[in-house]
């Protein structure tokens, strides 16, 4: 290392995607053949960089993101060999793959090395019991070798030097692959190793504290002499050696690096003398490598930076570098003399062997011209004849000479037309002269023929197609969801990530047993951040309270995204490698049921009286007993070796049944193939007799193993994955009446029997066997649409089984995200092989239909309202409730306000008219929640003021509007006690289910970001009570506070406690005006004053100047209870509108009992807004 060596180039690792963050590299290597530096990352990504400037050259993936990081590079004349966790990949240097090898014995690969055959053969190993030898030229595995140890690092010298995970180094013969010698280099592990010529150098760590299991790097580098097969004197390195490399040119020189960037150039024969350099890094060194030329080295740090070191005048990577292939520059188009006389044939066409893109298939219809405009006969009758045609009064509400696109109009007649925005409809209704809006053509009409089955059509009809939410400048709240849903069953919005699961959530919600379990668990004291069972309970409660309004499962999907197992299982849309949504829904159903099984057992439920009587338990069931009875299929699997006939048994439980279809059979001579029923397919799926290859412990080799199941019990909720994978399966489902609405199941002596139709009726009449009848709750359906429509999932559910009282008839409904409409049973149970196939089916025992356990509402765990997890006793902005004296209930009013931050900026594009069109609105996250007492002696005092710990990246803290800064939400710098979103949400959810009334200003947006559904009877919104519908404008909190309360709020920023208190004072004003009978007059005065100030409170400086010009200054005032000030005549509300004496008497302070400090105001003093 010459004296002029320094950092030459520093670049940041590229991000794996546009919406992702850069990640540290997991492997780096210099190419010995080309002037390239290669880097591998944790999601299977590989990048290469060219020259001293590290210009990005190529990038590609070697494996799915879920399989882990890139481990190591080796280089061949024909390309680069990359080692992944479960695969080995070889690619050309410009990117195209040469081969990719995957094998069942590749479980956790860590290292690889060339063998005695040079670069024609490699051996790969890892933390696994098998090493594999690969022919590089053929790309095949030619040998498998049992590994005596698990290896982490391999280097090739005279021997293959392999470092084990326990701190030793094995010298492996590169020809026979046998261990020649072992050397214990370090006590615990080896962090880095290099081998060249006659030397091996290692640095590692040792266990320093046995009790605490604390490891520390060793302050030396061990050296082993391969020529004499003996250890040499260690090289001391006080800064703790993290990485080491032997110099490729100077045979006895090593470069040692610490984690903090201190580098020593040491002579192995004279370790006491060294040259020291310091790398300028802000974190710690993760990777270190030296170039084959010895004239460059690279450092990779934890801050995702690459540091290239070398001499600025001599730096190069390899001595005999081959030139790299660069993209060929595009040839400029030839200049043509293009004029009217130029024949098109002079352009010519290139020679081709494949069909051109312009050769469209004959089945593609091209639009030519447009159909004539269809005029109403009544309109034509009013026209008058002239020499040049007909003329008359324009009564069609179109502009003169306006061209109408009749082609697109006819096309849209076959689809669900998007409704008008709510603001647009309100404006049109207000401006219409007659006020008659009944002629709106966008009314959702029922089909003319109710007996028509839409599922028999060759393509997906409009009611099954994918729906999109349109956004105006007012955001998603301006979209008319009611246009798509005129039932009392709530839909779910589909513009949030992972909303493919909407149909599965709806299906589980209308299964009474699952809904009971989720709500019982949510009502307990569980505050686990990633408890999906709690989130399911919150979603089910929202859907129940919505009464037809559209909901969203944002918090549920956030918890799902935060679950570590979700991404590897392919359950997340943004990271999935699963080929279809149907497969994702099936995987999600299995995952959710396992989570329910595990999480339900953690905390005993509120009450199990209903389940005890339903399942005839002799005692109150434990959580384990109940969840096993509801969800688990208990069976014993018998595995038989077809060679030695030995049998082994293995008990187990499953939560989901995968249907197993029989192989297709051809009809015999003169006969028909036997009919396959759903019951037979279900039986095969439950018992599942299969034959596959497996290890036989008696034969000590792989043999054909036959497995069959002996069924002991089936659950009360039967979740079935359809597993439709070929055309034969589609034909079965397309058979009319193939799926029954009821099935009967008998489990007798390990045998599973299933009956349907007439067979089921016959067994029920006989009454010989104990048969359990199951009702079909519903299905998740995969709608396979073609371009431009996208394939998606819908739910078809019989909601009659979830009603509080049995309706006496089936009530099938189609849940297409936020579109909900009733369908007939024939429509629900008819499938189409072309576009409508089931993905998940759900059955429940018939005796559990319409059984809702509502005990959780009366036994709700409210301890979270009285717990204070804030360790700071000083400067608290709130005081928690007193458990002895403050007990919220149905008569309690609480004032609520929240603050948000932005997670994603809105996506906006320009349409063909040059107007800005919102594709995706801004995405918000809850940052602060404040709840203020609305009654009692502590009225106006906050009892909740939570700041939320946000896991997602925040793009804008909206400080001007929220008062939130980056330091408020950073756990390292925040002066507030940050809580999880689950904790803050559960406090509000408990208040909601205690019956409290939420008071605030513009609560609709608060509830949307909180993701909670509050019934109208529990909402008091001051933006609605001080609103005139005829004015089409809602008033801000700051303006109302200035005009009615004479208070200036939100001067510099927002504070949620201040806003909640102000809303509470405004509500008290509203009660005064309403009680005095002057509410309408006051609203007119407010709007009149708003027009004079543009509905904004005047600035304080302007008002002070106005007061200085008055001849008589106003008297000093003192605030009263509502923030009002008396004027000079002794009247209250000095400068504000006076409130005359009430007709029914003054406001009486609420009386408080010995327990409820919140109090119960009289009905006359607290009417809800109408």
UniProtKB/Swiss-Prot annotation:
* Keyword Cytoplasm part of the UniProt annotation: yes
Kindly give the SUPFAM superfamilies that the UniProt entry links to this protein: Cysteine proteinases, Ribonuclease H-like, WD40 repeat-like
Compositionally biased tracts (Polar residues): 1109-1119
Q: Which reaction does it catalyse?
A: Exonucleolytic cleavage of poly(A) to 5'-AMP
Record annotation: effect of changing residue 899 to A:
Abolishes nuclease activity
Query: Could you tell me where the Acidic residues compositional bias lies?
Result: 443-452
Q: List the GO cellular component terms.
A: P-body; PAN complex
Q: Where are the WD repeats?
A: 104-144, 280-319
Primary residence? cytoplasm
Activity regulation statement: Positively regulated by the regulatory subunit PAN3.
The record's cofactor note says:
Binds 2 metal cations per subunit in the catalytic exonuclease domain.
Tell me its cofactors. Answer: a divalent metal cation
Q: Which UniProt keywords apply?
A: Cytoplasm, Exonuclease, Hydrolase, Metal-binding, mRNA processing, Nuclease, Repeat, WD repeat
Q: Where is this region: Disordered?
A: 399-459, 1094-1170
Annotated Basic and acidic residues bias: 1098-1108
Function statement: Catalytic subunit of the poly(A)-nuclease (PAN) deadenylation complex, one of two cytoplasmic mRNA deadenylases involved in mRNA turnover. PAN specifically shortens poly(A) tails of RNA and the activity is stimulated by poly(A)-binding protein PAB1. PAN deadenylation is followed by rapid degradation of the shortened mRNA tails by the CCR4-NOT complex. Deadenylated mRNAs are then degraded by two alternative mechanisms, namely exosome-mediated 3'-5' exonucleolytic degradation, or deadenylation-dependent mRNA decaping and subsequent 5'-3' exonucleolytic degradation by XRN1.
**Which protein is depicted?**
PAN2-PAN3 deadenylation complex catalytic subunit PAN2
User: Which species does the entry assign this protein to?
Assistant: Chaetomium thermophilum (strain DSM 1495 / CBS 144.50 / IMI 039719) (Thermochaetoides thermophila)
Ranked from the top, the taxonomy reads: Eukaryota, Fungi, Dikarya, Ascomycota, Pezizomycotina
Gene label: PAN2
